[in-house]
Amino acid sequence: GDGMGMGQVTLADSYLSYKAGELGGEQLAFSKFPYLALCNTYSANRNITCSAAAGTAIACGEKTNNEHIGVNPEGKPLESIAYVLHDKGYNVGIMTTVPVNHATPAAFYGHNSSRYGYYDISREIVDSGFEFFGGSGFYNYKGREGDKPAVDIYIEENGYDVCYGPKEFKARDKDRNIVFIQESGRETDPENYVSDGAEECDVEIAEMLEMGMEVLGDDEPFFIMCEGGNIDWAAHDNKTMTTVMEIISFDKAVQRALEFYEEHPDETLIVVTADHETGGLVLGYSGEYK
């Protein structure tokens, strides 16, 4: 969950407890996990990280400078866990509720000294060879100035089937790797929130996870990075209730992963984490301990 610190988790749990007529409690599926750990998120050059450096730390196991994607502070490419496992025969899926070329998902397949090199990062989807990508769209899909060939066309010309929305996904070419994009993200720089009038044609992250699992199949082991990216976006915008709803939406994906775990307990590992906390969220005191 991008930007999902302990404050955000506690708030979502508290909201769900209130809805259930309870005081306190662990309502989110991942709040009930048996193990909990905390970490420092400072980057190689700043006390306050950004998603690029933090995503790279998660993906590659090495701290780097803010704005760096999949490279060390000197700009040397790093190898992410996704590449390591792909080389070992795992199928790989990378998915998010924000643009697929945004910082955190990009850290698992991209290499760029600037997180804002969206166009070039998008083209690295092809280089990765990963079997499934999902997101709300592509930032700068025709380049920063809008004067380059559309990146989705480039991706399709180089071996992938780009599917806009569930209908195109169902009609996909099953012999090709897949990039799933929300219908509302067609030919635009996307921005969408679950509780802010999301398009009916769009799917939540749990449904995207289902799509990814369907593509990756069960004949080979697989690795999935599934990000609730809008948690961070809502927190940046000071939309507290939207932040809560995004966490609840993300938790539905965790619940689906748990169902898979229950079917394959000896070969499944689920890790829920955050690249950083966003917004310094604090649960306040109204004078009546509410």
Predicted segments with their positions:
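Short secondary-structure transition/capping motifs
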Residues: 47, 70-74
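Short, contiguous strand/loop micro-motifs
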Residues: 67-69, 199
